[in-house]
Structures are given as structure tokens and as C-alpha cells.
Amino acid sequence: MNPKAREIRFQFPVSGHIYDALTGSYLGKGDTVTRTLSRMHSALFLVAPERFDKPIVKVSGMTLDIQNKSGNDTVYRIEVISPAGKKLDCYTQKLITKNGKGQYHIPFALSDAKGDYTVKVIEVISRQHVLAKITL
């Protein structure tokens, strides 16, 4: 196997906003992308009709209202971090939005520690994210 890198041009059947699906990097708009790769590396691209926006999050009690400016359907990963800084896997969730809007209620337990919780909302393609606070 030859590890030498070479430039490869990828031509897609449609034009759109191109993302590197392995890193979340936005590569631009069009129907082609050129990358330098070796046989030891892989590439995976996504062509979307619209560019993915950073999520807009509003907190009301323990409920998150999540939307994006473009109104695109997308998927968000929601992570909850305790006041001690530990990610709480039991509250990690995926949220599929319709028309760019979705809602997630965090089902905190009565035994959860009091304090400020950080909620990280991540758009899964572009990996753009925002942080929100919820106080118990």
C-alpha cells in the first residue's frame, strides 16, 4: 500500500453546500471538491441544499426550544453537564427538528444535585453548537 498523498477531485451529481462529514468542516458551495489524500485516509462528504446554521436555543424552566434561522430540518445532539463538570449520559439525546424547530424537556430527577447545569446543543453535520444554562 502506497502512503503517498495525491490530489483527488470529487464530482457530485448535484450542487449544494458541501461539508466534510468526518470533521464537520464547511467546504463551500458547488458540485466539486478537491482534496489531497493518501491511501491511508478516507473521505466522506455531504452535499446539502442549504447551509446549516448554529442552533438558537431558548430555555424555559427545564425545556429547550431549539430552532435555526434557515428553517431546515436537521438533527441536534443535546448533552447535559452537571455542576461538577461531568457529562450526564442519561440526559444525552438526539433531537430531529421539523421546519427548523424542535423542543426537548430535560427530565431532571429530584435527587440531581442543585446548581447550574450546562446544556450543549450541537448541530450534528456542521458541529456548530451553543451552550445554555439551567439552574436547579
Language-model segments: residues:
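Aromatic/hydrophobic beta-strand junction motif of beta-rich domains
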Residues: 61-70
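Extracellular Ig-like/FN3 beta-sandwich strand-entry sites
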Residues: 73-75, 101, 114-116
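Aromatic sugar-binding surface patches on proteins
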Residues: 96-107
